[in-house]
UniProtKB/Swiss-Prot annotation:
InterPro entries: DNA-binding_RecF, DNA-binding_RecF_CS, P-loop_NTPase, RecF/RecN/SMC_N, RecF_2. PROSITE patterns: RECF_1, RECF_2. ATP binds at G30, N31, N32, A33, Q34, G35, K36, T37. Keywords: ATP-binding, Cytoplasm, DNA damage, DNA repair, DNA replication, DNA-binding, Nucleotide-binding, SOS response. One of its GO terms (biological process) is DNA replication. It comes from the Bacteria. PANTHER family: DNA REPLICATION AND REPAIR PROTEIN RECF. This is DNA replication and repair protein RecF. It comes from Clostridium tetani (strain Massachusetts / E88). Its main location: cytoplasm.
């Protein structure tokens, strides 16, 4: 799949933008704060209905305007699609696919699959578990509407259980069991799918990482569950999860929060059997992030039969020449949209037919 056409109205610093993209490589060049990343953000937003930069949709609307508009024409192997999203200042959004309104965000998933790699993605490797959980949840939601459903339901039950715990009172022990059973049902499905995804990430990521590092480093990914039970196989996750919740019930009532479940889980990233988050160098952490992103591309290809669109947001300048070469030689069958301040260092790796755009102060001109 690839983005054939992009139209923006009052999106960030763009009054209006109309561009046709090449199905292979597109490069947006410009100084900082000119609008390069805004182009990538609009494409990412059209893929899952949320930004990778902000949780406040109103920030996507140009200053002193009442709404913003995104229109994207997606060319696919089977059936082309047109996505239109209007973002309103009140925080609402209207989404149309082929001129038909969709009410559930999950209906948008899979129409335009995107993998983004930005400097902020280093947080997947080096920051707290919440960043790694977010990565898993986004990737799995793109691939499975059922996963997204389980995630939404789990979060809803978790919030209700935590509200009950915070409220306290004599009735809590009598009521809490209803929430425990629902948490175990939805949560076990989440854990099961996360573990499956990490196994794929492990298998594909190992090969990619060895190639990037010239066989010098071996990477591994291991799921870390807050449910401390070594006998938790695939068929018994729900049963054991429920046992753990019940076992921790009195402690949860005392502490007033839910202490076990996928909302507390993590995954370990090791390079040569050493924890990359704690002991990896900045270069190793960057390479691990690169591996994760490129493995994600292959996982999506394996699952749906075609590569997603790859968005590279000002990351090439952060990588050495060997990593730059790896990226630009690995994207021949993938539409890639790159932002950078200049192409001098990467020009030798680019195809002659790469489409170049100059971005300045919310204006985008094809070179």
């Amino acid at each position: 799949m690839y983005v054939k056409y992009l139209k923006l109205i009052n999106f960030r610093n763009y009054k209006e933008l109309n561009i046709e993209l090449d199905k292979n490589i597109n490069v947006f060049i410009g100084n900082n704060a000119q609008g390069k990343t805004n182009v990538l953000e609009s494409i990412y937003y059209a893929s899952i209905g949320r930004s990778h930069r902000t949780s406040k949709d109103k920030e996507l609307i140009k200053w002193q305007e009442s709404n913003s508009y995104i229109k994207i024409y997606v060319a696919k192997e089977r059936l082309d699609k047109t996505i239109e999203i209007r973002v309103l200042k009140e925080g609402k959004k209207a989404i149309n696919v082929n001129s038909i309104n969709i009410n559930k965000l999950s209906e948008l998933f899979g129409i335009l699959n995107v993998v983004i790699f930005s400097p902020e993605d280093l947080s997947i490797v080096k920051e707290s578990p919440s960043f790694r959980r977010k990565f898993l949840d986004i990737e799995l939601s793109k691939l499975s509407k059922q996963y997204y459903y389980n995630l939404v339901q789990y979060q809803k039950v978790l919030n209700e259980r935590n509200m009950l715990l915070k409220k306290g009172g004599d009735e809590v022990p009598n009521i809490i069991g209803v929430y425990d059973e629902q948490l175990a049902r939805f949560g076990s499905n989440i854990i099961r799918e996360r573990e499956k995804y990490l196994k794929k990430l492990n298998d594909i990521g190992k090969k990619i990482h060895l190639e990037i590092t010239s066989d010098k480093e071996e990477i591994s990914f291991t799921y870390l569950s807050s449910i401390k039970n070594k006998n938790m196989d695939d068929g018994k996750i729900e049963e054991i999860f429920l046992q753990e919740i019940i076992k921790n019930r009195n402690s949860d009532i005392e502490k007033r929060y839910t202490s076990v479940g996928p909302h507390r889980d993590d995954f370990l990233i090791n390079i040569n059997n050493v924890n990359t988050r704690s002991y990896g160098s900045q270069g190793q952490q960057r390479t691990a992030t690169l591996t994760i992103k490129f493995a994600s591309l292959d996982i999506i290809k394996d699952e749906i039969g075609e590569y997603p669109v790859l968005l590279l947001d000002d990351v090439l300048s952060e990588l050495d020449s060997s990593r730059q070469k790896y990226i630009l030689s690995s994207i021949r069958d993938i539409q890639t949209i790159i932002t950078c301040t200049g192409i001098e260092n990467i020009k030798k790796y680019l195809k002659n037919d790469a489409k170049i755009f100059k971005v300045e102060n919310g204006e985008c001109i094809e070179n």
